[in-house]
From Swiss-Prot:
This is Putative RING finger protein 095L. The keyword Mitochondrion does not apply. One of its GO terms (molecular function) is zinc ion binding. A zinc finger (RING-type) spans 39-73. SUPFAM superfamilies: RING/U-box (SSF57850). Gene3D superfamilies: Zinc/RING finger domain, C3HC4 (zinc finger). InterPro entries: Znf_RING/FYVE/PHD (IPR013083). It comes from Invertebrate iridescent virus 6. Pfam families: zf-C3HC4_3. It comes from the Viruses. Keywords: Metal-binding, Zinc, Zinc-finger.
């Protein structure tokens, strides 16, 4: 059984217009029952926090420590907790 989790980003007006034309570009994370997605920073904990506006993920502990995204280096404006089944 596959579970699809879509992260909807807060987008500024310019990005919203681009987004409407490219609906197929919604960032998706496809997770199967056998997958365990580990934190890309520590590799000790399962991911459960998404950074906004970039939508990259990490574990809760890492999300509390870092101010800029570890992948794209964008400033983290907000974090959103999520729970994988």
């Amino acid at each position: 059984m596959e579970i699809i989790i879509a992260f909807f980003l807060y987008l500024n007006d310019k990005r919203k217009k681009r987004f409407l034309f490219k609906k197929s570009k919604i960032p998706l994370m496809i997770i199967t029952n056998n997958d365990i997605v580990m934190c890309p920073i520590w590799y000790n904990y399962q991911v459960n926090t998404v950074f906004l506006p970039c939508a990259h993920v990490a574990c809760y502990l890492c999300s509390k420590i870092i101010k800029n995204c570890h992948l794209c280096r964008r400033k983290i404006l907000k974090t959103q907790f999520f729970k994988l089944p």
